Every structure is written in C-alpha cells, then in structure tokens.
Amino acid sequence: MTATPQEIQDGLAEILEEVAGVKTDDVAADKSFTEDLDVDSLSMVEVVVAAEEKFGVKIPDDEVQNLKTVGDAVSFIQKNN
C-alpha cells in the first residue's frame, strides 16, 4: 500500500523528532531541513536512513542534496514508494 503525502510527512516528522529533536508541530512541507529545522548534515544522513527503512525506499546519495524541504522528501518518497 502506498502511503499518502500526509502519512509520509507525519512519518518524517516522527523521524525528525527522534533524530534531530525537531518538534513534530514544526514540520511542514515548505520547511527547509537546514534553514528552518536546523538539521545538520550528520543528522540528515540519519533521517535518510530512517526514512529508507520506514518507507521501504532507496534514496541515493546524489539525490539527498536535492531534498531541501520536507515537501521535496515527501514527493520523492511517494514517487519511489
């Protein structure tokens, strides 16, 4: 079953809270991982690994740099789920 964008965003919010201490209420599609949510590069690697496991997708290293916002990640995961 394919997850809805909201389910993916909620899952990412849980991951961001666990990995980087981001409040789930602060996670929105238009939020930048680095600028708005203060996720550093090391934490981003952990977020990607957790998202791959949670959603059963592979996010190539060269694709990670294109995932600038939560919405970018949601779109990628939904397209590749």
PLM ranges: what are they?
Residues 44-66:
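Phosphopantetheinylated carrier protein domains
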Residues 21-22, 38-39, 57:
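Helix N-cap/coil-helix junction residues
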Residues 71-77:
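C-terminal structural segments of small proteins and small subunits
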Residues 28-40, 61-69:
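Glycine-rich loop motifs involved in handling phospho/adenylate chemistry
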Residues 2-25, 79-80:
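Thiotemplate assembly-line natural product biosynthesis machinery
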Residues 55, 77-80:
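Hydrophobic recognition helices of helix-based DNA-binding modules
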